[in-house]
Amino acid sequence: DRNIRFVGGIYDFRKLNSIRHYSYAYFHGHSVGGTNPSLLEAMASGCFILAHDNIFNRAVLGENALYYGSTDAAMEMLDGIDQAVSAYKKEYTGRNLEVIRRDYSWEKLADEHEEYFKWMLAQPRHG
């Protein structure tokens, strides 16, 4: 399909976020690890996300994405992509933006780290 682009590495963050924001859909193929920064960036850019189905992606996205388990399943998703975008884009992207604001703000993360360090300092020292 001429609308599918494999653009390679893009290291200009502003350009990358612009591409994400104006994309029709974003495939997130990471299958291992924890919270992936590129997934959070795609969520913050308002992307409609199609993600590899694994515990890490589901922990971040919840029900706010479409999931595929194999290359064949991903290809099948493309057959119905127009209907999926029409049905779910506004809902999924809106909820993903809420998750980003609520769970991944620098203020929240800094506060959580501060509380953890305070707790650590209050623990009895042994040895």
Locate the predicted segments by residue.
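A charged, aromatic-enriched C-terminal amphipathic alpha-helix characteristic of glycosyltransferases
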Residues: 86-125
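Short acidic active-site motifs
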Residues: 14-15, 73
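Nucleotide-activated donor-binding/catalytic signature segment of Leloir-type glycosyltransferases, i.e.
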Residues: 1-13
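Short glycine/serine-rich donor-binding loops of glycosyltransferases
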Residues: 36-39
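Short hydrophobic beta-strand element within catalytic cores of glycosyltransferases
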Residues: 44, 48-51
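Acidic donor-binding loop of glycosyltransferase active sites
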Residues: 18-34, 47
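Short alpha-helix at the nucleotide-sugar/activated-sugar donor binding site of glycosyltransferases
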Residues: 42-44, 58
